[in-house]
């Protein structure tokens, strides 16, 4: 199929596609590639009734355009081409047919183009310097866009959406390199300040606020609160450290151990029982006692010495109707639920249940 370009002498004819014709009052952008006299790259919104234009369906059927090799551009009068559509300039300059176009210019996002400008319009060219003066901000993006000529075949990513919001680098960094002046911590859920304005971590700040002094750096070990009185000694064992000071019948101060011993036995505590350390009730349970408690079974029936080992441990304590109710406690295998088969030579053992408990077995 041949594509015929429009010269400046011929009026712009209505060109519609039969299969893709649109009946709405659509407006199209007209792109032009020309020399110095023709506009570099603009789009005029032209009504289909006022001036004949190129009408087609919303599916844009465009072909890639090539840049002019020189700054002079493409000649105004062009002939019919028989080449492939990819080598044709789709919209030549039609400024003389349309007259002066006062529509707002079409912005092209320079940073987002997937191509580069022609070599003739780079640094040093007066046209390139003009484009730098006419930079403005696009209403869709916050980036600075220039009005230099661009090919419509190139993908203009700037029109696909608004420009990305620029975040300051400080938002992705932790707060200033702060350090607690007391403990040296650099990470804390909340920074606080002391009276002099220095940074404190949350723990040190709360401690200083509650106690009025700096938080101790070394965590003290958990120890008993020992009551110390200057010059106070037990009248019995003559110790000066105890968890609680008591008084004997005569009103003299005694330590906790001597006071309890006298309270229980009405006799003074012998000096041989004096110990250097203070024994507390927080005694650790030995591992042996733990194992014994685990091995002991509270549901095990008392053994009389005559019973045979039952295949099911809880059999003697359970009636037949109680098995479903204790299903959450016992999950024996299916073959254990059946009564064990006894040999003919072994005498059968019968159990009698009474209100008082299990009676000794009787041989049949």
From Swiss-Prot:
GO CC terms: nucleus
A Pfam family annotated for this UniProt entry: GATA
Molecular function (Gene Ontology), one example: RNA polymerase II cis-regulatory region sequence-specific DNA binding
Gene Ontology biological process terms, A to Z: cell fate commitment; negative regulation of transcription by RNA polymerase II; positive regulation of transcription by RNA polymerase II
Alphabetical list of SMART domains matching this protein: ZnF_GATA
Comp. bias (Basic residues): 281-293
Key words of the record: Activator, DNA-binding, Metal-binding, Nucleus, Repeat, Transcription, Transcription regulation, Zinc, Zinc-finger
Region feature Disordered, mapped onto this chain: 273-318
Zinc finger map (GATA-type): 180-204, 234-258
Subcellular location: Nucleus
General function of this protein: Transcription factor that acts synergistically with tal1/scl and lmo2 to specify embryonic dorsal mesoderm to a hematopoietic fate.
Entry protein name: GATA-binding factor 1-B
Gene name, Swiss-Prot/TrEMBL: gata1-b
């Amino acid at each position: 199929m041949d594509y015929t370009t429009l010269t400046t002498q011929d009026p712009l004819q209505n060109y519609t596609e039969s299969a893709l014709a649109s009946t709405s009052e659509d407006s199209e952008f007209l792109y032009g590639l020309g020399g110095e006299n023709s506009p570099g790259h603009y789009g005029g919104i032209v009504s289909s009734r006022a001036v004949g234009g190129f009408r087609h369906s919303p599916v844009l059927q465009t072909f890639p355009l090539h840049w002019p090799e020189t700054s002079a551009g493409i000649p105004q009068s062009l002939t019919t081409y028989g080449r492939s559509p990819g080598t044709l300039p789709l919209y030549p300059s039609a400024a003389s047919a349309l007259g002066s176009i006062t529509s707002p210019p079409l912005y092209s996002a320079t940073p987002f183009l997937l191509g580069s400008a022609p070599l003739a319009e780079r640094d040093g060219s007066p046209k390139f310097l003009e484009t730098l003066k006419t930079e403005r901000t696009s209403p869709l993006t916050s980036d600075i866009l220039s009005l230099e000529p661009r090919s419509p075949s190139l993908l203009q990513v700037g029109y696909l959406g608004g420009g990305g919001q620029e975040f300051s680098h400080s938002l992705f960094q932790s707060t200033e390199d702060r350090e607690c002046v007391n403990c040296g911590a650099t990470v804390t859920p909340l920074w606080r300040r002391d009276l002099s304005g220095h940074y404190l971590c949350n723990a040190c700040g709360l401690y200083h606020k509650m106690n009025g002094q700096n938080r101790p750096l070394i965590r003290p070990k958990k120890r008993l609160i020992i009551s110390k009185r200057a010059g106070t000694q037990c009248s019995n064992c003559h110790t000066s450290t105890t968890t609680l000071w008591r008084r004997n019948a005569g009103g003299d101060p005694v330590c906790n151990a001597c006071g309890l011993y006298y309270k229980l036995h009405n006799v003074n505590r012998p000096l041989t029982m004096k110990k250097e350390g203070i024994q507390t009730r927080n005694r650790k349970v030995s591992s042996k006692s733990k194992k014994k408690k685990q091995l002991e079974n509270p549901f095990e029936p008392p053994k009389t010495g005559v019973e045979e080992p039952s295949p099911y441990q809880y059999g003697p304590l359970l009636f037949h109707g109680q098995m479903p109710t204790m299903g959450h406690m016992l999950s024996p295998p299916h073959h254990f639920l059946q009564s064990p088969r006894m040999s003919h030579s072994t005498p059968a053992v019968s159990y009698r249940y009474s209100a008082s408990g299990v009676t000794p077995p009787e041989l049949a």
